[in-house]
């Protein structure tokens, strides 16, 4: 009886005649698809593509938080019920938040200065002819108030242009003091004449009354003379430059390369055989070389050694490739030594096997 009572308590009130649940249509009982009137507070659609960075949402849209069943008796957090305003704890305790207004920068506007305006002239005067606390060597070293107040109205590119020009003038003054002695000892005496004649294409700082430095003096470059006459011939090309040679005088010394005119000679100073050796050795100090037959007179021009006679740098012997039989059909292969002439048996019974059949996948499939 107790089990029936428990079953009745669970199921009969839901399914039986004691109690029936009323199902709600989709969208609620007040949905417009069933002909009901629209509610007094219609559902608002939020535009999620709009930015709300600079706008304080004081009276925001009331969200439609309709819960079904037992969930309609409570709400989570600060989400209000339907028809109520949102509760903002921060605005209730500290007031409305004030967001700083950040002005947008126009990145499409050009910052290249064209001409000298009044603001740029004031900045130039401040950077160059101002008091000592404003600028020193093209950098701000004084108080930030005096410099920033005058330079705030000038664009950043104009400011950098004036600073760079000031640094260049300071470097020119330093170079003038350090290089005064070098100007009197210049190797090219035509520098002053080129500047005075105007052939250099640069403005004359001396004629303009400005400072003169070594970096402001355009000098002509001396032309490199022609090569030595003996270098025109390939037989004498190694006389004036050892670095361009590639041969050696001895087999153990990488130094002292000799000239190209001695390659075909048979001097005793060379310990490497440069050509086919004779039958006997005239000089006992000379290292004996290997006799090369007439059929093997093919030399390596780099090492001077034969290709086939001495085995150094020789040709590899050709390996004979056995090309017998068809790897797909199996025709033409020779029988191996392990093959027996007996008739193979399967399961103890004598059966004739067709030896000419092709295995699955062919002989070259790797399974056989």
Swiss-Prot record:
What positions are modified (Phosphoserine)?
A: 30, 111, 146, 157
Q: Point to the regions of Low complexity compositional bias.
A: 129-157, 238-248
GO biological-process terms attached to the record: positive regulation of microtubule polymerization
Q: Where in the cell is it found?
A: Nucleus; Cytoplasm; Cytoplasm, Cytoskeleton; Cytoplasm, Cytoskeleton, Spindle
This protein's UniProt keywords: Cytoplasm, Cytoskeleton, Microtubule, Nucleus, Phosphoprotein
Where it mainly occurs, coarsely classed, is nucleus
Instruction: State the superkingdom.
Output: Eukaryota
Positions of modified residues (Phosphothreonine): 41, 102
For this UniProt entry, the molecular function terms from Gene Ontology, in alphabetical order, are:
microtubule binding; structural constituent of cytoskeleton
Where does the record place Basic and acidic residues bias? 81-93
What ranges does the record give for the region Disordered, renumbered to this chain?
81-106, 129-164, 196-256, 316-368
The keyword S-adenosyl-L-methionine belongs to this UniProt entry's keyword annotation: no
An annotated GO cellular component of this protein is: microtubule
Q: Which residue windows does the record flag with biased composition (Polar residues)?
A: 337-354
Function comment? Binds to all microtubule populations.
Q: Which family does it belong to?
A: Belongs to the MAP Jupiter family.
- Protein's UniProt name: Microtubule-associated protein Jupiter
| Gene that produces this protein | Jupiter
């Amino acid at each position: 009886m107790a089990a029936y009572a428990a079953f009745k308590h669970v199921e009969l009130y839901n399914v039986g005649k004691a109690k029936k649940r009323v199902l709600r249509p989709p969208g609620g009982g007040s949905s417009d698809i069933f002909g009901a009137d629209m509610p007094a507070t219609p559902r608002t659609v939020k535009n999620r593509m709009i930015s709300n960075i600079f706008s304080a949402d004081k009276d925001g849209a009331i969200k439609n938080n309709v819960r079904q069943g037992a969930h309609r008796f409570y709400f989570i957090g600060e989400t209000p019920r339907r028809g109520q305003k949102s509760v903002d704890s921060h605005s209730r305790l500290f007031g409305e938040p004030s967001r700083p207004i950040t002005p947008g920068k126009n990145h499409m506007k050009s910052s290249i200065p064209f001409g000298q305006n009044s603001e740029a002239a004031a900045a130039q005067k401040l950077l160059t002819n101002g008091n000592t606390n404003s600028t020193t060597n093209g950098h701000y070293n004084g108080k930030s108030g005096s410099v920033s107040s005058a330079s705030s109205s000038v664009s950043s590119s104009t400011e950098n242009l004036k600073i760079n020009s000031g640094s260049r003038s300071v470097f020119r003054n330093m170079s003038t003091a350090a290089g005064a002695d070098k100007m009197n000892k210049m190797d090219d005496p035509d520098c002053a004449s080129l500047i005075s004649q105007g052939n250099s294409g640069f403005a004359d700082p001396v004629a303009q009354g400005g400072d003169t430095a070594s970096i402001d003096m355009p000098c002509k470059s001396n032309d490199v003379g022609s090569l030595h006459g003996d270098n025109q011939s390939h037989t004498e090309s190694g006389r004036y430059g050892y670095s361009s040679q590639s041969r050696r005088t001895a087999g153990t010394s990488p130094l002292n390369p000799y000239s190209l005119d001695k390659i075909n000679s048979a001097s005793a100073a060379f310990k490497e055989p440069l050509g086919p050796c004779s039958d006997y050795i005239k000089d006992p100090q000379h290292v004996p070389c290997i006799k090369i037959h007439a059929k093997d007179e093919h030399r390596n021009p780099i090492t001077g050694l034969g290709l086939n006679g001495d085995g150094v740098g020789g040709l590899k012997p050709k390996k004979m490739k056995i090309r017998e039989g068809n790897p797909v059909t199996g025709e033409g292969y020779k029988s191996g030594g392990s093959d027996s002439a007996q008739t193979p048996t399967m399961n103890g019974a004598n059966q004739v096997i067709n030896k000419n059949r092709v295995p699955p996948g062919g002989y070259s499939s790797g399974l056989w």
